[in-house]
């Protein structure tokens, strides 16, 4: 299975901070924002990942992440010249996807919850159809909203409705089968001129091939698109890490646990960062394992 991180956009809600740097390169406590969505794909067992961003920002992502080998993954990069909709990611990434199943995660979404890795691996093992993730919110009119029947089977998906039919929002994480590229090509631009991910999900729903995984009580799904939400996310990660002593979205740790990195390689990476708490954490991890 392949994975895509969509890290484009102008980040206008975060101006003036994002006038000189991509939103997804901003820090969320002790890591660049893009570490968090990459960690989700890695937890799902995905090693081949495409980073899509603007032509202006791609060089910065390449400087930060390189070819991904230090995280036990294989990274490629592609340009999105203009933000023409989330579903455009599959058309841009057609050559990368190469007829395989593919997951898409938005570059400004953070997920944290117990047993999330197990849930992701189960979803990634499905060969047919699409899977989206639902999360209960108090302001559903801001999101794509899922309507369910009494057995929690999806009936409809509506983008930012004035009168939501439920309080379950579609989060920025999607898994699709090998048909996704051809289906994305069938989408016609919406009134705002974009290839909408909601339309793609509706197409799978019409075929009876859309599943919804619910992220329940106690799970955290954080958006980082505003100044306040960026601070809230940083404080959340800070609290978890300081209280429990482990790191959230530590890519080297996930790679090591997945046996994508050897202990020797982990030590080497840690030594390069030994003047930081992050590097000390990696050294401790290698010694204790």
From Swiss-Prot:
Needed co-factor(s): Mg(2+)
Pathways involved: Nucleotide-sugar biosynthesis; dTDP-6-deoxy-L-altrose biosynthesis; Bacterial outer membrane biogenesis; LPS O-antigen biosynthesis
Enzyme class: transferase
Enzyme Commission no: 2.7.7.24
Residue sites binding Mg(2+) per the record: 108, 223
Keywords assigned: Lipopolysaccharide biosynthesis, Magnesium, Metal-binding, Nucleotidyltransferase, Transferase
InterPro entries, per database record: G1P_thy_trans_s, NTP_transferase_dom, Nucleotide-diphossugar_trans
Function as written in the Swiss-Prot or TrEMBL entry: Catalyzes the formation of dTDP-glucose, from dTTP and glucose 1-phosphate, as well as its pyrophosphorolysis.
UniProt similarity note: Belongs to the glucose-1-phosphate thymidylyltransferase family.
Protein name (Swiss-Prot/TrEMBL): Glucose-1-phosphate thymidylyltransferase
């Amino acid at each position: 299975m392949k994975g895509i991180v969509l890290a484009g956009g102008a980040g206008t809600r975060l101006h003036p901070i994002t006038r000189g740097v991509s939103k997804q390169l901003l820090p969320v406590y002790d890591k660049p924002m893009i570490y968090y969505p990459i960690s989700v794909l890695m937890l799902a067992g995905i090693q081949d990942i495409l980073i899509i961003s603007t032509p202006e920002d791609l060089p910065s992502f390449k400087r930060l992440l390189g070819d991904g080998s230090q995280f036990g993954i294989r990274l490629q990069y592609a340009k999105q010249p203009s933000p023409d909709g989330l579903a455009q990611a599959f058309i841009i990434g057609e050559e990368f996807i190469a007829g395989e199943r593919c997951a898409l995660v938005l570059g400004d979404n953070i997920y944290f919850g117990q047993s999330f890795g197990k849930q992701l691996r189960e979803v990634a093992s499905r060969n047919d159809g699409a899977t989206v993730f639902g999360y209960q919110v108090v302001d559903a009119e801001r999101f794509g909203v899922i309507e369910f029947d009494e057995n929690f089977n999806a009936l409809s998906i509506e983008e930012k409705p004035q009168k939501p039919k439920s309080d379950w929002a579609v989060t920025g994480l999607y898994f699709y089968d090998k048909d996704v590229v051809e289906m994305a090509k069938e989408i016609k631009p919406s009134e705002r001129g974009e290839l909408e991910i909601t339309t793609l999900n509706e197409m799978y729903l019409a075929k009876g091939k859309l599943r919804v995984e619910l992220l329940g009580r106690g799970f955290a799904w954080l958006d980082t698109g505003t100044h306040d939400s960026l601070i809230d996310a940083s404080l959340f990660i800070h609290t978890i890490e300081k209280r429990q002593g482990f790191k959230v979205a530590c890519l080297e740790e996930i790679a090591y646990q997945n046996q994508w990195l050897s202990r020797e390689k982990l030590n080497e990476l840690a030594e390069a960062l030994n003047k930081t708490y992050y590097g000390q954490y990696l050294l401790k991890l290698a010694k204790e394992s």
